[in-house]
Amino acid sequence: MKPYIIGISGISGSGKSTFAANLKTKCGDFYAGDVVIINLDGFYRSINEDDMCLVKAGEYNFDHPYAIDLDHARRCISAIADGHLVAVPIYDFEKKKCVGHYEVNNPRVVIVEGIHALHPKLFPLYDITAFLEVPMSVALSRRAVRDNKERGRTPEDTAEMFRKFVLPMYKLHVEPNVKKAAILVNGLNTGVHINMLYEHIKPLLIYPRF
């Protein structure tokens, strides 16, 4: 059975992870094991000693596509599509390296989410794609809350990272993908599109897609 693969992109802080989680929740507990979320953050490259100096100086660009091993991500998603048991990496942002894996085995629906989810290396793998749009002020505010909670950064640090890396990389590498997305989602009101996607994939959960 070939899984149905959904790609979800948008600027950092647009609500991609929440959108993916809410879509999976919408599918209900009965089908929870048939719906898998793959966060591309898991494919961040482990930081070597030389790059660690850049990280400590606030000069390492985590928002550039190269920071994520997109080739590895493509191989994993392709293998899942082909029905193989796949070990998906888990990245630790504190240690700046891969710290383990979790197994994905024969899901019916795969939700791939990340800022570079619609990168040309990954785009051909999807059956449908969505792009979340929010005002930049909202994206920055959400990013500041997450960075403070998960990474101990001050709002000032987050604002500087946003100005230096997030926004330029978004304009250069992420925003151009908007025109390729099948669905544009208002990141401030996602309920309509969650319901729409759910109705789209519900038959796939009931009847296998060969």
Curated annotation (Swiss-Prot):
Cite the GO molecular-function annotations of the record.
ATP binding; kinase activity
What EC designation does it have? 2.7.1.48
Q: Which UniProt keywords apply?
A: Host cytoplasm, Transferase
The consequence of residue 41 to A is: Complete loss of uridine kinase activity
Identify the Pfam families for this entry.
Answer: PRK (PF00485)
Location within or outside the cell: Host cytoplasm; Host cytoplasm, Host perinuclear region
Known consequence of changing residue 16 to N? Complete loss of uridine kinase activity
Q: What is the name attached to this protein's record?
A: Uridine kinase P10
Q: Is the keyword Transferase in the record?
A: yes
Relate the assembly described in the record: Interacts with host eIF-2B; this interaction disrupts the interaction between eIF2 and eIF-2B, which leads to the inhibition of stress granules formation.
Which residues does the record give as ATP binding sites? 10-18
Q: Which family does it belong to?
A: Belongs to the uridine kinase family.
Q: Which InterPro entries match?
A: P-loop_NTPase, PRK/URK
Natural source organism:
Beluga whale coronavirus (strain SW1)
Question: GO cellular component annotations, sorted alphabetically?
Answer: host cell perinuclear region of cytoplasm
Role noted for this protein: Inhibits the integrated stress response (ISR) in the infected cell by preventing the sequestration of eIF2B by phosphorylated EIF2S1/eIF-2alpha. Stress granule formation in response to EIF2S1/eIF-2alpha phosphorylation is thus inhibited, which allows protein synthesis and viral replication. Phosphorylates uridine to uridine monophosphate.
Give the highest taxon in the source lineage. Viruses
